[in-house]
Amino acid sequence: MNLHEYQAKSLFAEYGLPVSEGFACDTAQEAVEAAGHIGGNLWVVKCQVHAGGRGKAGGVKVTGNKDEIRAFAENWLGKNLVTYQTDAKGQPVAKILVESCTDIANELYLGAVVDRSTRRVVFMASTEGGVDIETVAEHTPELIHTAIIDPLTGPQAFQARDLGFKLGLNPTQMKQFTKIFMGLANMFNDHDFALLEINPLVITTEGNLHCLDGKIGIDGNALFRQPKIKAMHDPSQDDAREAHAAKFELNYVALDGNVGCMVNGAGLAMGTMDIVNLHGGKPANFLDVGGGATKERVAEAFKIILSDSNVKAVLVNIFGGIVRCDMIAEGIIGAVKEVGVKVPVVVRLEGTNAELGREVLAKSGLDIIAATSLTDAAEQVVKAAEGK
């Protein structure tokens, strides 16, 4: 689960981090009133969506004119913002963040992630702020400095000072950076973050550190113990099919291809997508039906896959372990009849009662292609998607 920038900054403020005065507005009139409440003669207005690249897409504007604030809000509220991080449809804009403008002397980067290799929270800092950290990591990795947080001792001030020295901060800024670092580390732990970024963390013309942006990703598995964070969820930013799938405990991720994939097990699902790609196809989705591949769940999975008009064929790849393949086959048949599938369906069954499952499919009288292996399944579904 991701948070909006205004939500992230609200958390920053709770932990004493320096952020701009700002208001998240639902209407153009609120945006104009927010500028008046903030005061000054220069403001920043930002579309609130779960995606980066807003500035390049026209979703951020610096202005000293309240009429321009009104026009910006009227233009974007209720519309979709398309950036390089969204799909072609973009993300809906339901709120506009109006903030005081900050004079910038320099831009830094500060972020943290859960590193699987060390099984620790790792902080990253760089003098290359304001650009994608992935780009920095690819071209100038030596400019990224790290600090690994030991879960037994927690964040330490000396780690902040070490990063601060590498960023070239002066003594005053070092104290500010240490406070920011410690606050973020505690926040990361308290609220079960999976990702945290301040990009950029700026040095103002007065020489002070300031959190100009905020990006937070939450560990979805921990939401049961984070009711406050869970209440911040904005369902409008979710893919409609992914949200529907979650109601049935189906793990679904929409992609751009034309081969629908229905698989039990995340690892097998990724392997299935790989082999479809290997044979010249493009997966339309990742869909893991999990261990309980019942008729009802399979039917919902078909409905979700076929709600994508780009899908030209469906590959069902099931390994029967605890669940028997003959039962899965009956579920597939029932689902195909219920949903009224109009595209070719290729089914590969392996595991417990796999042969019996294939017999059940063959006797169904439905236009279901039974594959003998995963390679055969991939070849057949790619041909079917191409109309061959």
From Swiss-Prot:
Domain ATP-grasp residues, every copy: 9-244
Name of the protein this chain belongs to: Succinate--CoA ligase [ADP-forming] subunit beta
Organism this protein belongs to: Shewanella frigidimarina (strain NCIMB 400)
Annotated positions binding substrate: N264, G321, I322, V323
Keywords: ATP-binding, Ligase, Magnesium, Metal-binding, Nucleotide-binding, Tricarboxylic acid cycle
Cofactor: Mg(2+)
Annotated positions binding Mg(2+): N199, D213
Cellular compartments per GO CC: cytosol; succinate-CoA ligase complex
InterPro entries in the record: ATP-grasp, ATP-grasp_succ-CoA_synth-type, ATP_grasp_subdomain_1, Succ-CoA_synthase_bsu_CS, SUCC_ACL_C, Succ_CoA_ligase-like_bsu, Succinyl-CoA_synth-like
E.C. designation(s): 6.2.1.5
Enzyme class: ligase
Record-stated family: Belongs to the succinate/malate CoA ligase beta subunit family.
This protein's pathway: Carbohydrate metabolism; tricarboxylic acid cycle; succinate from succinyl-CoA (ligase route): step 1/1
GO BP term, pick one: tricarboxylic acid cycle
GO molecular function terms listed in the Swiss-Prot or TrEMBL record: ATP binding; magnesium ion binding; succinate-CoA ligase (ADP-forming) activity; succinate-CoA ligase (GDP-forming) activity
Residues noted as binding ATP in the record, renumbered to the chain: K46, G53, R54, G55, E99, T102, E107
UniProt function note: Succinyl-CoA synthetase functions in the citric acid cycle (TCA), coupling the hydrolysis of succinyl-CoA to the synthesis of either ATP or GTP and thus represents the only step of substrate-level phosphorylation in the TCA. The beta subunit provides nucleotide specificity of the enzyme and binds the substrate succinate, while the binding sites for coenzyme A and phosphate are found in the alpha subunit.
PANTHER family xrefs: SUCCINATE--COA LIGASE [GDP-FORMING] SUBUNIT BETA, MITOCHONDRIAL, SUCCINYL-COA SYNTHETASE BETA CHAIN
